[in-house]
Swiss-Prot record:
Tree of life domain: Bacteria
Record's subunit section: Heterodimer composed of CysD, the smaller subunit, and CysN.
Gene3D superfamilies: HUPs
UniProt keyword ATP-binding present: yes
SUPFAM superfamilies linked to this entry: Adenine nucleotide alpha hydrolases-like
CDD domains referenced in this protein's UniProt entry, alphabetically: Sulfate_adenylyltransferase_2
Organism of this sequence: Shewanella pealeana (strain ATCC 700345 / ANG-SQ1)
Enzyme class: transferase
Identification of the protein by name: Sulfate adenylyltransferase subunit 2
Keywords per UniProt: ATP-binding, Nucleotide-binding, Nucleotidyltransferase, Transferase
Pfam families linked: PAPS_reduct (PF01507)
């Protein structure tokens, strides 16, 4: 009897699970980055599948900037409790002491101190030699040219001109002490693949991905949700209740909402089939300077 041909999503799933298992077997101290978004939720689901019925054999790490949506933090804690994985949370103590804020210090400085430097602090603190990330090649041009196994030197920096060849899904994970590999098991997935897989597997998500009335203000052509009382309002500026959802999630002052009526997975998938814009257009950190994402990745950002 001929072997059953795998569907497109089954092929992607099998590839990702193979990568996750290979890293767990090859490296001494791996970690999975957990940003609480849809890609992280899919990656967590794949890791649970990869080692079922056992537990995930490595911790999950959330680098908390102290400016995430409240619903994201609540969802993170609920997931850790429900699935019983080890959750590490790191906040840059120097950044907290300095009172770093995206409003007062700008997106570039906030991202560098609270995310990039915070991430490097956590990786050094725990001595991780491999870190899973949920980035996909279709998201952004600098990520499109990055390998599945992305080598980082002892300073956690990335050199796009010095990447290792990956032939026939053969990955080179050799590192010296202090060096590490960033691993992207979702590299070959698209945003639509992610949503179709979430629907197929019934994966839980932060409610922010679904349309509902939310208080927003318009700034620089983007709708920013007023998530807490730390957000300064200009004179005469009043939040308006708009029917919106988020395609991508990050720090709430730096993440734009979109008008949408998609309040179910089916409606979101239908919306994705019609859209012609990138999900990253809703992230201010991708446009705060020229070649923004590649520069951040060279400095140690995921």
């Amino acid at each position: 009897m001929a072997a059953k041909e795998l569907s497109h999503l089954q092929q992607l799933e099998a590839e990702s699970i193979q990568i996750i298992r290979e890293v767990a077997a090859e490296f001494d101290n791996p970690v999975m980055m957990y940003s609480i978004g849809k890609d992280s939720s899919v990656m967590l689901h794949l890791a649970r599948k990869a080692f079922y019925p056992g537990k995930i054999p490595f911790p999950l790490l959330h680098v908390d900037t102290d400016w995430k949506f409240k619903e994201m933090i609540a969802f993170r804690d609920e997931q850790a409790k429900e699935f019983g994985f080890e959750l590490l949370v790191h906040k840059n103590p120097e950044g907290l002491e300095m009172g770093i804020s995206p409003f007062e210090h700008g997106s570039a400085k906030h991202t560098d101190i609270m995310k990039t430097q915070g991430l490097k602090q956590a990786l050094n603190k725990y001595g991780f030699d491999a870190a899973f990330g949920g980035a996909r090649r279709d998201e952004e041009k600098s990520r499109a040219k990055e390998r599945v196994y992305s080598f980082r030197d002892k300073h956690h920096t990335w050199d796009p001109k010095n990447q290792r060849p990956e032939l026939w899904r053969t990955y080179n994970g050799a590192v010296n002490k202090g060096e590490s590999i960033r691993v992207f098991p979702l590299s070959n997935w698209t945003e639509l693949d992610i949503w179709q897989y979430i629907y197929q597997e019934n994966i839980q998500l932060v409610p922010l991905y679904f349309a509902q009335k939310r208080p927003v203000v318009e700034r620089d052509g983007m709708m920013i949700m007023v998530d807490d009382d730390r957000m300064p309002l200009a004179e005469g500026e009043q939040p308006k209740e708009e029917l919106v959802r988020f395609r991508t999630l990050g720090c709430y002052p730096l993440t734009g909402a979109m008008h949408s009526e998609a309040d179910t997975l089916e409606k979101i998938i239908e919306e994705m089939l019609l859209t012609r814009s990138s999900e990253r257009q809703g992230r201010l950190i991708d446009s705060d300077q020229s070649a923004s994402m590649e520069l951040k990745k060279r400095q140690g950002y995921f």
